[in-house]
Amino acid sequence: MAESMDIIELIDSDDRFGPTNALLPASGRTDLKEWQKSVQSLLRTLQRPRYVATGLLPEFQQLDARNAFIQNNQLPHYDKAEWKSSDMSLQEKLQIYADAMADDPAPLIEELNARLVALDDIVYCEHYCTEGGLSLDDVDLWARLRSITVIGGVDWPKGLRKYMDNISELADVPTYDGMAI
């Protein structure tokens, strides 16, 4: 995500790409960062297997691409170094992803729903997450929230859902609701 944010900042500040400064800089809000940290493991467990399982995202339509994603993106309770070690085969990783998809997601989704309610309380309004206008905070947060839409059964708080839909429309980038599993 850090490299993507660097690219966005470059494009937004260089007039070769069009009008500049369309986005306010990141605010440095610690509450947003804390929320993101609080759901990291939960989202990895729910999202990553679903990305691969949908088969609908262009980047996962080829078997080699799905395998590369699985090879490089650990699920909890593995750390990155352990996951990437040569001690774990692709077959073992595929099985871990399959097991994650087979597990009942209801308890994790219930926890996620509660965390979304907490986030709804700190998102400034339905048009941007930080007071002052559209900023790099929105680019970061919306991308993370968009990835949640691949998870079926999530109950979005009304304000947060409006925020998601507004940014989706503004950016002309759809959510994954239609392929949620």
Language-model segments: which ranges?
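Structural helix-adjacent loops and short alpha-helical linkers that scaffold large soluble proteins
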Residues: 153-158
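Short helix-to-loop capping/linker segments positioned immediately adjacent to catalytic or ligand/cofactor-binding
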Residues: 21, 47, 124-131
